[in-house]
């Protein structure tokens, strides 16, 4: 990657983290940063070690773990905060990442 491409990849990361609860599609993102879709996908994975939406999912799950361990939010509130349309999608994603349900995670915290 050249400096300009790297700058655009970093911008892409900033954009998806800023709008994590309503992220743009890959096509929208590539248009917004003015970088080809293929270059975006390859460059992002090369720079951050994982595909765009895996990076975003990991970010959301880490954020979920922080919010849940704070004890101020219940599972449904965290689900809404992270932009999930329903809590069952959130619970499934959380369990896939951490191996336990959010409720079990809260009890262990």
Role assignments for model-derived ranges:
Residues 10-18, 23-28, 46-85, 107-109:
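Terminal helix-turn-helix DNA-binding modules in bacterial transcription factors
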Residues 69, 91-109:
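…primarily DNA-binding HTH/wHTH and HhH modules…
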């Amino acid at each position: 990657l050249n400096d300009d491409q790297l700058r655009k990849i970093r911008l892409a990361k900033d954009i998806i983290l800023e709008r994590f609860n309503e992220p743009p599609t890959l096509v929208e993102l590539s248009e917004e940063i003015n970088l080809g879709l293929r270059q975006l996908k390859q460059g992002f994975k090369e720079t951050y070690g994982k595909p765009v939406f895996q990076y975003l999912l990991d970010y959301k799950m880490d954020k979920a773990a922080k919010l849940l361990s704070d004890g101020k939010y219940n599972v449904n509130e965290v689900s809404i905060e992270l932009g999930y349309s329903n809590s069952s999608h959130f619970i499934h994603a959380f369990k896939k990442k951490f191996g336990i349900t959010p409720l079990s995670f809260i009890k262990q915290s």
